[in-house]
Amino acid sequence: MEISGTVLRQVSYVSGYGTHTRSRGLAPRFGVRMGMGSGFCDEGHLRYYQDTKKVLTPKKKLKLLKGFSKLGLASDPEKLAMFYDLQQNLTSDAGDVLLRELEAARAKEKEVKKKRKQEKKAKLKAAKMNCESSSSSSSESSDSDCGCDQVVDMNTFRAGVGVGVGVGVGVVAPAPVEESPLPKTAPIVEDANAHCVAMELCSKNDIYVSSASNGFKNESAVVTSAPQKRIEVCMGNKCKRSGAAALMQEFEKVVGVEGVAVVACKCMGKCKTAPNVKVQNSVDHNSLAQGLDDSVKIPANPLCIGVGLEDVDAIVARYFWESHTDIGMAGAGAATAT
């Protein structure tokens, strides 16, 4: 009994040797080696790189039908038959023909759209160029439209006039010519009432005065209202930022109420680093400047560009020299009286 018990124990120990719960589900290694050593089950990897014919899916063919109807290709009887064939059988070969037709029609439509876009772009470019040319021409012709005969740059004006300008008068008197003396004109006497009446008539719609007065005489007894002398200060955005309001106040201080109005005007189109001033002095070259050199003549209705506060006295003395001289003489007389 003891011998049989020991034999059973040894057999059970030997049979359980080397077993473990984790090693029960492992596959034998020789099976894996056999799987790795076998070849490809089919030749699908070779057919993948071959050129296959493009086959339309039913979804693409339905999309083709919609595009075919939109482009109006159904007007052709032959293509209409293909259209019906494709509607009945979406897997037919008629879809390939219609697809080529549709692609050609789409390419043609794209070409037409491209041409339209180019034409529209060319028209916009031409309109922009015309607008720029018209704006430049309008700015160049603004002097003639507003009655300006000459554009005066104040840098050149300061260099040429600043040396010969006196304290009271800002214009150099021309030397007398002995050979052809200027005809003397009798001064026109105006009283205060007639002057005020004339200024009121100037502000209205050029009313003609048929009755002659003591201050205004004419052979035909019809007198045209004379243009008013005034100084127009540009009030554009650029000129405002460069001190146009202060310049206008300075002109009002210097000119006063001696028949010269200081007003604001719209942008003149030549704004630079300083405000622009348009002078309406109504100079008549035929009667006042005959026989004078061009350098001595006073330009009528000039446009002064780049005007500063230091140029106010010079402009008033240059273009309104008669009234400025009267103002200076009146101030000097008042100073001597005191």
Swiss-Prot record:
CDD domains tied to this protein: TRX_Fd_family (cd02980)
Localization (cell): Cytoplasm
Pathway where it operates: Glycerolipid metabolism; triacylglycerol biosynthesis
Range of residues in the leader sequence: none
Cofactor: [2Fe-2S] cluster
Any single GO BP term: triglyceride biosynthetic process
Compositionally skewed regions (Low complexity) per UniProt: 132-145
One GO location term (cellular component): cytoplasm
Tissue-specificity statement: Mostly expressed in flowers, accumulates in stems, seeds and pods and, to a lower extent, in leaves and roots.
Highest taxon above the source species: Eukaryota
Official protein name in the record: Diacylglycerol O-acyltransferase 3-2
Gene name of the record: DGAT3-2
